[in-house]
């Protein structure tokens, strides 16, 4: 694993990077997509909310889990960008725990391995509005991805 963390816009990463962010399980609540970086994901990927809503409902999913969304770059599945939606909490106003974020990160690492994803970008997941300690979350990420052939880029604005 190659790990890099720096100030910058997550969405400036090359499109070869899969992206990850945290969401709540109450995705059908309009407020659940209205704050933080999740709002920016919805703005940049307009169909993400509807896809996640449908996936949660159709599969009767509960948190913690990871929902994969593909964003088509040019109508070719092999060129689709992968977005990992880490469902780390029940309600948009609640907070995740280290247990739920660990389960999601572990699942995402397994998915990256099975999908042969070599590039992953993310914000400081669970640490903005969700208030988890970044040093702890970073250690979870490094532990779960340590044996993978992947480059992880973390971006933050503040």
Task: Briefly describe each language-model feature range.
Residues 1-158:
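Macrodomain-like recognition of ADP-ribose-binding/processing modules
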């Amino acid at each position: 694993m190659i790990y890099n963390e720096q100030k910058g816009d997550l969405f400036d990463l090359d499109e070869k990077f899969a992206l990850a962010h945290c969401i709540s399980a109450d995705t059908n609540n309009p407020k659940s997509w209205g704050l933080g970086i999740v709002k920016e994901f919805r703005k940049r990927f307009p169909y993400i909310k509807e896809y996640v809503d449908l996936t949660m409902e159709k599969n009767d999913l509960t948190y913690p889990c990871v929902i994969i969304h593909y964003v088509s770059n040019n109508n070719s599945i092999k060129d689709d960008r992968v977005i990992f939606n880490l469902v780390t909490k029940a309600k948009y106003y609640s907070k995740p725990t280290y247990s739920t974020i660990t389960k999601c990160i572990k699942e995402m690492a397994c998915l990256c391995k099975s999908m042969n994803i070599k590039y992953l970008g993310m914000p400081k997941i669970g640490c903005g509005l969700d208030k988890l300690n970044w040093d702890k979350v970073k250690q979870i990420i490094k532990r779960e991805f340590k044996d993978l052939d992947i480059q992880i880029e973390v971006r933050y604005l503040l």
